[in-house]
């Protein structure tokens, strides 16, 4: 079983939102992982992904890392290496400034973790 509650906060002009990803059986989980492969295929073709695809990619990253028994601190510290601003559509880095996860995975206790500015914007410029 995979149960992920993701709370997203962005810039002040972007309303916060919550998404719940729940996959109770192997079939549902396979659909989730197949959708992640489609997103990775888009990235491999140098196509930019949107907010929902970016959030799904981070959820997949969290699941993979927790199943590999990686520490929460390491997961949080490495989140900024998952996506760069040139791989996402305009506005995605501003929308995903902070992502807080509550994750129940298989029969393990609930884990909580947060990503702060997971998409680095140091070389990111909006044209006016």
Where are these regions (language model features)?
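Non-transmembrane, aqueous-exposed alpha-helical and coiled segments at domain scale
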Residues: 1-128
